[in-house]
Regions:
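Residue-level detector of beta-propeller blades
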Residues: 22, 69, 151-152
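Conserved active-site alpha-helix within GNAT-family acetyltransferase domains
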Residues: 133-156
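C-terminal "cap" of GNAT-fold acetyltransferases
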Residues: 157-186
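Short amphipathic alpha-helix that is part of the acyltransferase structural core
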Residues: 4-66
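Short strand-loop junctions, especially beta-strand C-caps/beta-turns
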Residues: 96-101, 130-134
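Conserved GNAT acetyl-CoA-binding A-motif
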Residues: 119-134
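A conserved beta-strand-loop-helix scaffold within acyl/acetyltransferase catalytic domains
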Residues: 49-67, 71-90, 94
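Conserved acetyl-CoA-binding loop-helix of GNAT-fold acetyltransferases
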Residues: 98, 104-119
């Protein structure tokens, strides 16, 4: 990767450097939380911000571009994730999102690399994230995950998959809890 001024050259392609900020309890109220929520006065926004504020105490990290609604990554220690997974010393990525018009410029790579560096600094053994065999809304793109070295760790009957990126060969493979692998409604 070469740089020139504010621009970076990735694979010979010149791209504008995007600046990032970590959202914390201290700046949460003034920051836009680029998510599927567009109206900043909506009750969903205040609910999401309240949820985030509580999760920061559990180790949640929210890293986003300073440009409103462009790209972000949200992750938390897997033991605190709001998903039925079993794993030790992994980081769970709640969301990795880049605005469609900005895809292909390396922004998701920058965010993912920041997550990896932070996770390793915290002594974690790897990352995990939800996806599916075929791309589904609000789930990570399986082609992107495979491209970045993630592998399928487990799959539920509803085709939802748990993907993981171990930092070493000794890292235990995460899994779904038994209650979700074969979901049934009992009457």
């Amino acid at each position: 990767m070469k740089t020139k001024g504010d621009n970076v050259f990735l694979s010979g392609k010149e791209v504008l450097v995007m600046k990032y900020i970590q959202v914390t309890k201290e700046n949460l109220e003034k920051e836009h939380i680029c998510c599927a929520i567009s109206n900043t006065k909506d009750a969903q926004v205040s609910s999401k911000k309240a949820w985030l504020s509580e999760r920061f105490d559990e180790g949640l990290v929210f890293l986003k571009s300073v440009e409103r609604g462009k790209c972000f990554i949200e992750y938390i220690p897997a033991e605190k994730a709001w998903n039925p997974i079993e794993t030790e010393d992994y980081i769970y990525i709640d969301c990795l999102w880049v605005l469609g018009s900005l895809k292909g410029h390396g922004y998701s790579t920058v965010l993912l690399e920041a997550c990896i560096a932070d996770s390793k600094a915290k002594g974690k053994k790897g990352l995990c994230i939800l996806s599916a065999a075929k791309k589904k809304p609000f789930l990570a793109d399986p082609k992107y995950l495979a491209y970045k070295g993630f592998k399928v760790a487990d799959e539920a009957d509803n085709d939802i998959q748990l993907w993981y990126l171990p930092f070493s060969n000794e890292a235990k493979v995460p899994s779904f809890k038994a209650c979700v692998k074969h979901s049934h409604i009992f009457m």
